[in-house]
């Protein structure tokens, strides 16, 4: 019969993991990533918590005859910034979640 994990030890590990997750989530509020589109004509800065902090548009990108192009560049830059921020969050929060593997709980696939 496999050795059962110590309940007190498991609770301490869960509490430690919760603390690490809270710290990582707080840090994501201040960490920023940047993405651009149109060769840098549109740039978006976003936090790891998915709050857009800045959108910069090069004046050369503004063509009243081609508003659709500008809209497409803004959309592409925002979507790329979101993807980058999500990758950052996965990296930061994944480290905090690593503690689950050490709990030895059967059935969690960890």
Task: Give, region by region, the residue ranges found by the protein language model.
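Long amphipathic alpha-helical segments used for membrane anchoring, targeting, substrate engagement
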Residues: 1-30, 34, 84-110
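Residue-level signature of catalytic and energy-coupling elements of molecular machines
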Residues: 14, 50, 74
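Stable alpha-helical structural segments in soluble proteins, enriched in small hydrophobic residues
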Residues: 73, 77-88
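Short, exposed beta-strand "edge-strand" segments with a Pro/Gly-rich flavor and a Y/T-containing core
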Residues: 2-3, 53-56
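A broad detector of the eukaryotic-type serine/threonine protein kinase catalytic domain
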Residues: 6, 57, 78-79
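N-terminal intrinsically disordered, cationic/polar leader segments
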Residues: 30, 36-53
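A short, well-structured alpha-helical segment
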Residues: 68-72
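A short interface-forming secondary-structure element
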Residues: 39, 55-67
